[in-house]
Design a protein with these regions (language model features):
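Alpha/beta-hydrolase fold nucleophile elbow
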Residues: 20-32
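Short beta-strand/loop motif that positions the catalytic acidic residue
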Residues: 150-152
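Conserved loop-alpha-helix segment in the C-terminal half of the alpha/beta-hydrolase fold
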Residues: 154-193
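Alpha/beta-hydrolase active-site loop
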Residues: 1-19
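Alpha/beta-hydrolase-fold enzymes
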Residues: 29, 33, 37-123
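Catalytic active-site module of serine/aspartate enzymes centered on a nucleophile-bearing elbow/loop
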Residues: 188-225
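Active-site nucleophile elbow and catalytic-triad environment of alpha/beta-hydrolase enzymes
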Residues: 122-141
């Protein structure tokens, strides 16, 4: 992908079909990159007749990097990505995330490892560019006119070996970036920390994901009765 706005047409078409099936309200939801995409969609289409609330599950509002890397390295890679979109660069993603999920390793879930491989050592620079451009809009502050719930783990870690941190933390993104960028947003915005949550909160350990759903449904009862 070279521009996250490429997804807008697909989301709009899906909402059109949902409306044709006589549904009158939708909770727009997205995880990680999807959380970034859906947040911006809600900002860009503030008067959509179906979208009544937004749930962002550990949204990708910034890269899990140092301040220097964010201010210098990422913009430079983004610029290279505009010129050399297919070039690859080390992703820096923690190698223990997928093993914490998949039943083949240490997790409880079954999914296609060709689609979501055990590790992703490299990333195309066009992806870095697309994400960076979208994040710049988030960082400036956006307005959301629908109730928004941003949920994330209570902590981020970058474990170098398998252990408890990989099972009870967000090892992909920095949760502080989520809360800091949420504070820049205008509207009915709520952030919620989930103790021992994984990056994808609904794939966390059973007691944790049960709490995720309890909190989400309690919020929905207030915002989308």
């Amino acid at each position: 992908v070279r521009d996250l706005r490429e997804y807008d047409a697909e989301i709009s078409k899906a909402l059109e079909i949902i409306g044709q099936e006589n549904h009158n309200q939708v909770l727009l939801a997205g995880h990680s990159t999807g959380g970034l995409i859906t947040t911006l969609y809600a900002a860009h289409y503030p008067d959509h007749r179906l979208v009544k609330a937004l749930w962002a599950n550990s949204p990708f509002y910034d890269f899990f990097k140092s301040i220097i890397e964010k201010k210098v390295g990422i913009p430079l890679l983004s610029e290279f990505g505009k010129r050399f979109p297919n070039a690859k660069f080390p992703s820096g993603l923690n190698p223990w995330y997928v093993p914490s999920l998949h039943k083949k390793f240490h997790g409880e879930w079954e999914f296609n490892l060709e689609w979501k491989p055990e590790s992703m050592p490299f990333v195309q620079l066009c992806f870095v560019h697309a994400i960076h451009e979208a994040q710049k809009e988030i960082h400036k502050g956006i307005t959301l006119n629908i109730p928004t719930l941003i949920m994330h783990s209570h902590q981020s870690k970058y474990p170098k070996k398998w252990g408890i941190d990989a099972q009870q933390s967000d090892v992909i993104l920095d949760v502080k970036d989520m809360t800091n960028n949420a504070k820049k947003m205008k509207g009915d915005i709520q952030t919620l920390s989930v103790h021992n949550g994984l990056h994808d909160l609904v794939l966390s350990a059973p007691p944790v994901r049960e709490k995720v759903y309890q909190d989400l449904f309690a919020w929905l009862e207030q915002k989308m009765p």
